[in-house]
Amino acid sequence: LRSRDFWLLAGSFFICGLSTNGLIGTHLIPASMEHGIPEVTAAGLLAAMGVFDLVGTTVSGWLSDRWDNRRLLCWYYGLRGLSLLFLPYALDSRFLGLAAFAVFYGLDWIATVPPTVRLTADTFGREKVGIMFGWIGASHQLGAAVAAFGAGALRASLGDYQVTFMSAGLVCLVAAGLVLRIGQRSSDRALPAGRLESVES
């Protein structure tokens, strides 16, 4: 728990849960209905996200073995944030805009999991990856719970979901910056050369 990398991973995964299961999984259908989109149509778009999610997560797993996982997460959270910022306008444009959102957001939905698991293993070792990712995964569920309740409370207070979706988009952009700091040691310069080599090994 003293590890900065743990809190960066847990914090970014908290935002992942907040912006997916808690927000979109819970509130997309009611938000769509408020914009005149039938419930069955909105549910169908949410189901279509699951199909694109399968594709996106599979490709993400392949990429996580070949690319810098921090940069992958930066792209994923950045694109998710931009998608959420676009969502209020997609809802206003009715079906076509929401369909475009479903494609891009669906591809990104669980794409964050493979690089997060890989970074957890690289940071804490394969012997500890199970328990460490368990705690990081718990933060994901906590984020989902916060968003499920918080988005509903904001909707009841403000009368619509626009502020909620825009705020979640901005939070995802913050996460895109945070994940780039995973694995960076601020104390490297203060360590003697021999000690630094032992830490890096």
Place the predicted regions along the sequence by residue.
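Interfacial helix-cap and linker-helix signal at transmembrane-aqueous boundaries
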Residues: 32-33, 63-64, 151-159
